Amino acid sequence: LDLTSGRDRGRLYRIAPTGWKPRSVPHLSHAKTADLVALLEHPNSWHRETASRLLFERQDASAVDGIRHLLRNSKSGLGRFHAIGSLEGLNALTADDVIVGLKDSVAGVRERAGWASEKLAPSEAVLDTLAALTDDENARVKMQLGFSLGEFPPSETRREALQSLLAGSGGDRWIRTAVFTSLGTEASDAFL
């Protein structure tokens, strides 16, 4: 087998049928901020991720209201997911935004909101909403909840939420690991 065979003939980049015309690639770097916000719920991942990156790079505060509207009203779970990250990237994420995300019908959005909640500790309203998720049906949400609760200062609400997570983990080692990571020196209290 000659591995150098064909080296003098160039490289094939695309095989396409005769008459096929490639679609144009959008130049999102020239897009208006409002258009980038709308792209956060685009079905194509490249559009969503590029729009999110450009919003972060621009740090345009005029995007915040549109992103907040998207978080609360988008029919796209991926759009709501990216809205949380974009608000966080613009340093505009509030406890109300996180609570909206934690109450979302899509598990991935709840998980992302749980992660974002860590920056808002010690918000009591966020802690109470996190504590209400201990019986969530999604294991990834529960695991993130276990980690996120560790960022909040010790309290009765936090301890009870971690105990509830541990009791309802169904033997899931990842959830248990998250809970024990958050308990730290309070681990003995969880068993009393």
Residue locations for each model-derived region?
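Long, ordered, helix-rich scaffold segments
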Residues: 2-192
